[in-house]
Design a protein with these regions (language model features):
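Short phosphate-binding loop-to-helix
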Residues: 27-74, 82-90
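Residues at the starts of beta-strands that form the adenosine-phosphate
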Residues: 18-20, 72, 99-100
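Hydrophobic helical membrane-anchoring modules
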Residues: 165, 169-180
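N-terminal glycine-rich phosphate-binding loop and ensuing alpha1 helix
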Residues: 1-23
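Conserved core of the sugar-phosphate nucleotidyltransferase
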Residues: 56-62, 69, 81-168
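Short beta-strand/turn micro-motifs composed of small residues
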Residues: 24-25, 77, 104-105
């Protein structure tokens, strides 16, 4: 089978993005390049931003500075393999109306707090799940913004934020062994 990152790159390859940049550690350059995606460029990240505790924003800003990027950036996460080309294209289309975009899913779950009280519904007027509007949750699949503002705010989202709603099954994120 294909590695986890393949599914994200494949969906991006067929999307409306002009260029795909993958930030990797040096030992993985040849491994990534063997997949021959025509839009693909590989960026070798600084070892200080290759640690498990490194923030995504640190890698983004490092890339922006190193390559002098002045462009719109779609940050896609390889840990969200169920993101489809149409999801990326939907976010790209929405972007013209917003400063930044975050992908989300609608959850229709009833949430309780640590004290034993419901957080998102009235205990004595519980809606049917089918009638429950639910709430939107980041699924971590992708974010869109401009390099200048990402750097200025040191954040992947800022300003007027658009929420790109995706199918509920895209909530899956594979960040740790427990997620498998």
């Amino acid at each position: 089978g294909n590695p986890l990152f393949f599914w994200t790159l494949d969906a991006l390859q067929w999307s409306n993005v002009d260029r795909i940049i993958v930030a990797v550690d040096l030992p993985y350059v040849d491994y990534i390049n063997q997949y021959k995606f025509s839009k693909l460029d590989v960026y070798v990240r600084d070892p200080k931003n290759s640690r498990d505790e490194s923030a995504t924003e640190d890698v983004l800003i490092e890339l922006i500075d190193s390559w002098n990027l002045d462009d719109d950036i779609l940050l896609a996460q390889a840990t969200s393999p169920l993101t489809r080309t149409k999801d990326y294209n939907k976010g790209i289309k929405m972007y013209s109306d917003y400063d930044s975009i975050v992908s989300v899913v609608r959850q229709k779950r009833f949430i309780w707090n640590d004290e034993g009280y419901p957080s998102n519904y009235n205990l004595f007027n519980r809606p049917r799940r089918q009638d429950f509007k639910g709430y939107l949750v980041e699924n971590g699949a992708f974010y869109i913004g401009h390099s200048e503002h990402i750097k200025k705010w040191n954040n992947r989202v800022y300003g007027k934020i658009g929420l790109c709603e995706m199918d509920e099954n895209s909530y899956l994120e594979l960040d740790s062994e427990e997620d498998f």
